[in-house]
Amino acid sequence: MNHFDVSPVNDLTADLLFNLPAVQYVEGLTQDFPRRPSKTYLLYFKHFPKFMVGDIQGMAHAADLLYLFDAGDLDVRKLVPFPIDPNNWGPEETALKYKYMHMISEFVKTGNPNKGVSGLSTCDWPPFDPQRRSYLQFAEYPEVKNDLKGDRVRLWRQQIPMWIKQYPIDEASPNM
């Protein structure tokens, strides 16, 4: 398994707990678009930290906090309950940390994260709107993309409900 492979169980969990709710949330915040311009930005932190060891492959929940705060090793272990090896934190991780900290602090100060991104990369991150559905895929080289996990979001929102209607579960069935 290379570091870009993620298990189907992790994908399922990420969809149900993070991806689908995040997309639904930003859609709700931008429902008045274009009448009211969007000030909502969607970010997908796609990075595979070298300090994560064991079975965790990819950006685990709350691991982005290591890029946002100056936390020591003991604090990190309290914040991120995953096996880590702080000795694997290298220059790439430090550079990414400063990009992330700068971008988030710029967003907090101004409401627009682009000053934090444009000075450190070549992307222009537009606010989310229901038509373009833009988001920032944040990694060593940030990239603006559209329709976060679109196929999987459509699976959960359209295909699975359709299947449930087509193939209802018979509660009286002895096979259950």
Range-by-range predicted roles:
Residues M1-E92, M103, T110, P174:
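Substrate-gating cap/lid region and adjacent catalytic-acid/histidine neighborhood
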Residues N10, L66, R133, V153-R157, ...:
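Generic detector of well-ordered alpha-helical segments enriched in charged/polar residues
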Residues A14, K115, L120-C123, R154, ...:
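Intrinsically disordered, low-complexity, compositionally biased regions/tails
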Residues E93-S118:
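Non-catalytic, well-ordered alpha-helical segments in soluble enzyme domains
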Residues N114-K145:
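Mature extracytoplasmic/periplasmic domains
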Residues V144-M176:
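C-terminal helix/juxtamembrane-tail motif
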